[in-house]
């Protein structure tokens, strides 16, 4: 039997009951990748030999009834900006082509402790800069629901692989929507946890005050299980939060009667397509039928999210990416005749167009004479956006709206128009700016392309988001659609 579309929960049950061996699961997954990924192009690197070896070691533990770990024998795919010891980590960039880390990221250590099995590294926008996975130096990933459409980005490979049944779960990173937007486009579940919930140690930095690692799965409960496994304070990350409550599954089945949900009028305003508005309005009616109270509210500074985000994120990126100088590691220009030339040529040849655009933008925003007008002002706007959310959360438990203003666009449609591409982040960037948790769950389709519903919660209240998402999923899901892709 093929297990490629089974849930983590079901696979765990089969393994615990000894109906299937971890090595059978892993081999089945590689067979699926061999069959499907030449078309989808979600993986950048596979770790097949080590994965099968690890799975066979787990077979022996299974035979002895020593099945420790929440994710015992469960295959996983990891976005290629998350450090994996002894497995190439490129950030989908020429700059890091061939870079093999000598240490492990915290999330990978946690997943290894739970006995999950690394299948391979997943494609992404270069250095997580992009919303379509088209800025990858190596390949363009396709949307499993429609091969003429992008999978979203920057975690496009992570979302596409899960939707196509190539792994039961993946990890992505979310700086301004990079987990939630591709989850929306690919019809899967993507969670951006509260800033500080998951350690960033071993995540190649894009914008350090915004980046957060999170899980992508085909259902809500699986997502909660993975977040339980990777959450927690870490001495290696001073921004990780000492929050003890990492139980997201015990209350997941509780009803949502009486829960107060806010629908910001700005989230169904200008720029949001009619089909997305219709699906979200239907989803709101579903939430009401489940017993939730939904009211319209205002988040007046929403429209300033994109300009504020792109100034702050680009500024932090220009500082973070200064470390790629062609000397210590990464691409090294062979033509340079001097130290200055080495810096210039290594960076101009090693980085792609979108990365260079954001470095230029960030360096300009931080430069003398412009710092106050751009960076400082953007930080003030960030505070206003956070204050808007704080005010709403005084009276409401959850904020609801679309994840993205449209369904997935066509490959090649927006890659030469950065402003149009950036506009897709309208509804996701405010969540990062405020440091809040946000989850995308499927809520509809238009012309075969999925639509995502975004649920936004109070800081460190992922538990409530999972409850609402789980109840909604009982009324609408794409579980039967995946196998027909």
From Swiss-Prot:
Gene Ontology CC annotation, any one: glutamyl-tRNA(Gln) amidotransferase complex
Protein biosynthesis among keywords: yes
Active site (catalytic residues): 79, 154, 178
Catalytic activity: L-glutamyl-tRNA(Gln) + L-glutamine + ATP + H2O = L-glutaminyl-tRNA(Gln) + L-glutamate + ADP + phosphate + H(+)
Enzyme Commission numbers on file: 6.3.5.7
GO molecular function per UniProt: ATP binding; glutaminyl-tRNA synthase (glutamine-hydrolyzing) activity
Pfam families: Amidase
UniProt entry tagged with the keyword Protein biosynthesis: yes
Regions annotated as coiled coil: none
Keywords from the named record: ATP-binding, Ligase, Nucleotide-binding, Protein biosynthesis
GO annotation, biological process: translation
Family label: Belongs to the amidase family. GatA subfamily.
Annotated function: Allows the formation of correctly charged Gln-tRNA(Gln) through the transamidation of misacylated Glu-tRNA(Gln) in organisms which lack glutaminyl-tRNA synthetase. The reaction takes place in the presence of glutamine and ATP through an activated gamma-phospho-Glu-tRNA(Gln).
Name of the featured protein: Glutamyl-tRNA(Gln) amidotransferase subunit A
Organism: Staphylococcus epidermidis (strain ATCC 12228 / FDA PCI 1200)
Lineage of origin: Bacteria, Bacillati, Bacillota, Bacilli, Bacillales
């Amino acid at each position: 039997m093929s297990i490629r579309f089974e849930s983590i929960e079901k696979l765990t049950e089969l393994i615990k009951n000894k109906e299937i061996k971890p090595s059978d699961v892993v081999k089945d997954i590689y067979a699926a990748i061999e069959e499907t990924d030449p078309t989808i192009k979600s993986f950048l690197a596979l770790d097949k030999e080590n994965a099968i070896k690890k799975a066979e070691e787990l077979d022996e533990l299974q035979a002895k009834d020593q099945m420790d770990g929440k994710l015992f024998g469960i295959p996983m795919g990891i976005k290629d900006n998350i450090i994996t010891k002894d497995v190439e980590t490129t950030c989908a960039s020429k700059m890091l082509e061939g870079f093999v880390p000598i240490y492990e990221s915290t999330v990978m250590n946690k997943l290894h402790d739970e006995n999950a099995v690394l299948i391979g590294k997943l494609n992404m926008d270069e250095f997580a800069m992009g919303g379509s996975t088209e800025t990858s130096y190596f390949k363009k990933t396709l949307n499993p629901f429609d091969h003429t459409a992008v999978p979203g980005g920057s975690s496009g490979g992570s979302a596409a692989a899960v939707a196509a049944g190539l792994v039961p779960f993946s990890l992505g990173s979310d700086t301004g929507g990079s987990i939630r937007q591709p989850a929306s486009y690919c019809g899967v579940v993507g969670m951006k946890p509260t800033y500080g919930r998951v350690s960033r140690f071993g995540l190649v930095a894009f914008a350090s005050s915004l980046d957060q690692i999170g899980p992508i799965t085909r259902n809500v409960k699986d997502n909660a299980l993975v977040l339980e496994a990777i959450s927690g304070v870490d001495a290696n990350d001073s921004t990780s939060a000492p929050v003890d409550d990492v139980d997201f599954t015990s209350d997941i089945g509780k009803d949502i009667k009486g829960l107060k949900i806010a629908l910001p009028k700005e989230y169904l305003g200008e720029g949001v397509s009619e089909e997305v508005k219709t699906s979200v309005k239907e989803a709101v009616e579903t939430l009401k039928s489940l017993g939730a109270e939904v009211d319209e509210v205002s988040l007046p500074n929403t429209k300033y999210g994109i300009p504020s985000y792109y100034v702050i994120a680009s500024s932090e990126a220009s500082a973070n990416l200064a470390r790629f100088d062609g000397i210590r590691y990464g691409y090294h220009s062979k033509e340079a005749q001097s130290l200055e030339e080495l810096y210039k040529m290594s960076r101009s040849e090693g980085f792609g167009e979108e990365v260079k655009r954001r470095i230029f933008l960030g360096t300009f925003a931080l430069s003398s004479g412009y710092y106050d007008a751009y960076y400082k002002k953007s930080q003030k706007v960030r505070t206003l956006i956070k204050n808007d959310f704080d005010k709403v959360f005084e009276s409401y438990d959850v904020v609801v709206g679309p994840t993205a203003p449209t369904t997935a666009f066509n490959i090649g449609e927006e890659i030469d128009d950065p402003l149009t591409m950036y506009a897709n982040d309208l509804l996701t960037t405010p969540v990062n700016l405020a440091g809040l948790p946000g989850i995308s769950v499927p809520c509809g389709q238009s012309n075969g392309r999925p639509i995502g519903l975004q649920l936004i919660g109070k800081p460190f209240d992922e538990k409530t988001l999972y409850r609402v998402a789980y109840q909604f999923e009982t009324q609408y899901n794409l579980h039967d659609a995946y196998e027909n892709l």
